[in-house]
């Protein structure tokens, strides 16, 4: 059999290769010589960025090489924090409307996606410091005092803009987190506390979920959901009392039914939900939680596909911040053990306390799985609601505006 690559002959066909020489690769102009605009170093102001790595150990005549890595990693973090804040402000601006333009939802999704990717990078980037030995860190640690990552203004601004509640913060040396900042920084922090956080904006957005409430034309999602839950619980109770079950199995199934029923009652009863908010166990309002659940159940509908992505990215942001905090805790324990932090905190013990649900902004979204029901119990959408969720509310308006 002839080789399929030989064209029936003994020689290989002509191969396409990249030109490594010749006139084609030299056909261009040197715009720098012609004085066109700024050069790469000028545009990026590299003279400022690349000269900002001042090793304190070197200035003291005892240069420690790993101090350079330590500085670069933290400077890179601050640059990425700035980008996250920039993108977060764009997302917040798009959400900060009585009616969110649904044709802009993709821009919100893209902004959150970018934030997630940056946080993924930072989660891995901090582990680069693991290439530094604890003994090498000790050699230049004395030059850091009283500097501490706790003093990162951008990180605190980012937390506030996301929606970290002040009352949920772990105190730093039994003091308010703002006590380490000067007057100008305090003004910036106070501004972010007064602004609407991403959590607040998402809550308002979810409360307006289409089809959530009953109207004269449609029963609404929530009343149908309550009926479905009651049927689901009734079936669970019947399963527990099945005559074919042994008494031991019946006892176990009854206990499971009781726990499941209590869990559903905590969301079906608005008063119980409000009590959970007062206790600090939940953050989103009852209506916002109902809206999120509706999006979860009907995420395949065109109008809910991007909102579902938004909710997913919000949980990703929380997850990645938790992972970053955890990686930071492990790093500090490895480098310091039980020593006090350079800023005066308890070091590892303080940081470990921040790796908790207290710092999860969108904790309620994680807990939605508690109240999901099997697919066969999910309420059917009415024909009217199918139509509502198949077309963006302001799509027709946008198209008519463009035609004008």
Swiss-Prot record:
Cofactor: heme
Pfam families: Trp_dioxygenase (PF03301)
InterPro entries in UniProt: Trp/Indoleamine_2_3_dOase-like, Trp_2_3_dOase
Keyword Iron attributed: yes
EC code(s) of this entry: 1.13.11.11
Binding positions (heme): 328
Top-level taxon in the UniProt lineage: Eukaryota
Pathway(s) where this gene product acts: Amino-acid degradation; L-tryptophan degradation via kynurenine pathway; L-kynurenine from L-tryptophan: step 1/2
SUPFAM superfamilies recorded: Indolic compounds 2,3-dioxygenase-like
GO biological process: L-tryptophan catabolic process to acetyl-CoA; L-tryptophan catabolic process to kynurenine
This protein's record includes keyword Amino-acid biosynthesis: no
Protein purpose: Heme-dependent dioxygenase that catalyzes the oxidative cleavage of the L-tryptophan (L-Trp) pyrrole ring and converts L-tryptophan to N-formyl-L-kynurenine. Catalyzes the oxidative cleavage of the indole moiety. Involved in regulation of protein homeostasis, longevity and reproducive life span. Specifically regulates proteotoxicity due to age-related aggregation of proteins like alpha-synuclein, via its effects on tryptophan metabolism.
Homology family: Belongs to the tryptophan 2,3-dioxygenase family.
Quaternary structure, from the entry: Homotetramer. Dimer of dimers.
Protein's recorded name: Tryptophan 2,3-dioxygenase
High-level lineage: Eukaryota, Metazoa, Ecdysozoa, Nematoda, Chromadorea
């Amino acid at each position: 059999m002839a080789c399929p690559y030989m064209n029936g002959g003994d020689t290989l066909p002509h191969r396409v290769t990249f030109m490594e020489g010749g006139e084609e690769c030299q056909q261009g102009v040197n715009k720098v010589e012609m004085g066109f605009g700024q050069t790469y170093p000028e545009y990026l102001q590299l003279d400022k960025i690349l000269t900002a790595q001042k090793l304190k150990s070197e200035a003291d005549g005892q240069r420690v090489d790993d101090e350079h890595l330590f500085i670069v990693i933290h400077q890179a973090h601050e640059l990425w924090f700035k980008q996250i804040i920039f993108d977060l402000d764009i997302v917040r601006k798009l959400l900060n409307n009585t009616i969110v333009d649904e044709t802009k939802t993709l821009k919100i999704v893209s902004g959150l996606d970018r934030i997630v990717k940056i946080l993924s990078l930072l989660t891995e980037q901090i582990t680069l410091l693991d290439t530094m030995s604890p003994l090498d860190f000790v050699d230049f640690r004395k030059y850091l005092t009283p500097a501490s990552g706790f003093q990162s203004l951008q990180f605190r601004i980012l937390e506030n803009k996301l929606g970290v509640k002040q009352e949920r913060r772990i105190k730093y040396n039994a003091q308010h987190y703002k006590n380490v900042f000067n007057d100008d920084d305090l003004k910036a922090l106070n501004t972010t506390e007064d602004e609407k956080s991403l959590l607040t904006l998402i809550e308002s957005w979810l409360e307006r979920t289409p089809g959530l409430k009953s109207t004269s034309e449609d029963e609404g999602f929530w009343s149908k959901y309550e009926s479905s839950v009651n049927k689901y619980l009734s079936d669970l109770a019947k399963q527990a009392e099945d005559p074919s079950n042994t008494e031991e199995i019946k006892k176990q199934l009854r206990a499971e039914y009781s726990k499941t029923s209590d869990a559903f009652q905590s969301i079906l009863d608005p008063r119980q939900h409000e009590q959970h908010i007062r206790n600090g166990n939940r953050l989103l309002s009852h209506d916002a939680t109902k809206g999120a659940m509706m999006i979860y159940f009907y995420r395949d509908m065109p109008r809910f596909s991007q909102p579902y992505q938004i909710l997913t990215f919000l949980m990703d942001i929380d997850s990645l911040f938790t992972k970053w905090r955890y990686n930071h805790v492990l790093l500090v324990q490895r480098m310091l053990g039980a020593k006090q932090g350079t800023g005066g905190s308890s070091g590892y013990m303080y940081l470990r306390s921040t790796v908790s649900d207290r710092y999860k902004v969108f904790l309620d979204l994680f807990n939605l799985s508690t109240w999901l029901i099997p697919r066969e119990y999910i309420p059917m959408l009415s024909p009217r609601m199918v139509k509502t969720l198949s077309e963006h509310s302001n799509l027709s308006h946008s198209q008519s505006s463009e035609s004008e």
